[in-house]
């Protein structure tokens, strides 16, 4: 592991942020991403980019961060005790897109690299990331396209990768207190170093590069579908699950808050509007009920 390895990862991530913002701003057609560069007093910094009140995107955030510190936070050493006493660097791109139209799913993507070093010891490093889709009014065509794109990105790295990381995604994006998944899943991987640096880095790039290929065709298909206030209300209600997951379970959110990260960037993923209703239940035989009965049931979408 050399300094040039770390520089290559950082250069890729900065370029990925640029590319994703360009593509999504073009899809929106009205607003652009506004950048907020920031520095972290304890070490590092980042570029937060947010698009709000667009024609298609109600709120979208695409964040790059590169932070470093002299010791690991509790959230990281809890399941990796060998990291205690090491300095660390973490860099990544993380994004969440909340569309206006309830027929367009929310999407989340993240790719990241982590390294912990100590004098006289081999560095501990890994890649992580993935992407997942959260529909409000599900569509089989969209789910198949999303998962087929994910499967194709994984294919060059072995037949085991897609089913393994698809299953991990289903398990990770799960709200235990609701006993339901957050959406229809996608990919989730973490602690990836078994392929060696070059191939592990290549895999992370394949995932990062395929996100817009997975998401943009779905947005284009659904962004002009008509909707009513009741459907908008259901979208806002379901966004509540997004908030619950991010604040209760999400590793990245917890890591960021525990390391004294930049709160505005960490909470950038939260939707601008959301609603909770006491003991709400969908009416039988409605599209809302179908979300629970069909789409929030893990299944094999890829062909």
Curated annotation (Swiss-Prot):
PROSITE patterns (alphabetical): COPROGEN_OXIDASE (PS01021)
Any one Gene Ontology BP term: protoporphyrinogen IX biosynthetic process
Catalytic activity field: coproporphyrinogen III + O2 + 2 H(+) = protoporphyrinogen IX + 2 CO2 + 2 H2O
Residues reported in the UniProt entry to bind substrate: 94, 110-112, 260-262
GO MF terms, alphabetically ordered: coproporphyrinogen oxidase activity; metal ion binding; protein homodimerization activity
InterPro entries associated with the record: Coprogen_oxidase_aer (IPR001260), Coprogen_oxidase_aer_sf (IPR036406), Coprogen_oxidase_CS (IPR018375)
Region (Important for dimerization): 242-277
Residues given in the record as a divalent metal cation binding sites: 98, 108, 147, 177
One Pfam family cited in the UniProt record for this chain: Coprogen_oxidas
Site entry (Important for dimerization), positions: 177
Entry annotation: catalytic residues: 108 (proton donor)
A single GO cellular-component term on record: cytoplasm
Required cofactor(s): a divalent metal cation
Subcellular locations according to the entry: Cytoplasm
Pathway(s) annotated for this protein in UniProt: Porphyrin-containing compound metabolism; protoporphyrin-IX biosynthesis; protoporphyrinogen-IX from coproporphyrinogen-III (O2 route): step 1/1
KW Transmembrane helix (keyword) present: no
Enzyme Commission designation: 1.3.3.3
Function in brief: Involved in the heme biosynthesis. Catalyzes the aerobic oxidative decarboxylation of propionate groups of rings A and B of coproporphyrinogen-III to yield the vinyl groups in protoporphyrinogen-IX.
Subunit organization: Homodimer.
Protein's UniProt name: Oxygen-dependent coproporphyrinogen-III oxidase
Organism of derivation: Saccharophagus degradans (strain 2-40 / ATCC 43961 / DSM 17024)
């Amino acid at each position: 592991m050399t300094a040039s390895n770390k520089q290559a990862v950082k250069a890729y991530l900065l370029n990925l942020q640029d590319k994703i913002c360009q593509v999504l701003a073009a899809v929106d057609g009205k607003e652009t991403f506004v950048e907020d560069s920031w520095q972290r007093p304890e070490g590092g910094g980042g570029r937060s980019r947010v698009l709000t009140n667009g024609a298609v995107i109600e709120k979208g955030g695409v964040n790059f961060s590169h932070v470093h510190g002299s010791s690991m936070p509790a959230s990281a050493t809890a399941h990796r005790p060998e990291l205690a006493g090491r300095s660390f660097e973490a860099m990544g791109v993380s994004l969440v897109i909340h569309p206006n139209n309830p027929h367009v799913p929310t999407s989340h993507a993240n790719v990241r690299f982590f390294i912990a070093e100590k004098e006289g010891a081999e560095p501990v490093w890994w890649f992580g990331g993935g992407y997942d889709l959260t529909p409000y009014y599900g569509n089989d065509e969209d789910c198949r396209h999303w998962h087929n794109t994910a499967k194709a990105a994984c294919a060059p790295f072995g037949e085991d990768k897609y089913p393994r990381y698809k299953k991990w995604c289903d398990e990770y994006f799960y709200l235990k207190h609701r006993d339901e998944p957050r959406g229809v899943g996608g990919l989730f991987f973490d602690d990836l170093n078994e392929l060696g640096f070059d191939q592990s880095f290549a895999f992370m790039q394949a995932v990062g590069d395929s996100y817009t290929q997975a998401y943009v065709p779905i947005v284009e298909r659904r962004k002009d579908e008509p909707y009513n206030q009741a459907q908008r209300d259901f979208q806002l209600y379901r966004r509540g699950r997004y908030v619950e997951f991010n604040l209760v379970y999400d590793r990245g959110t917890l890591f960021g808050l525990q390391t004294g990260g930049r709160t505005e960037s960490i909470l950038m993923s939260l939707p601008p509007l959301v609603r909770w209703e006491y003991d709400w239940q969908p009416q039988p035989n409605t599209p809302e009920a179908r979300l629970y009965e069909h789409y929030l049931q893990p299944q094999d979408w890829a062909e």
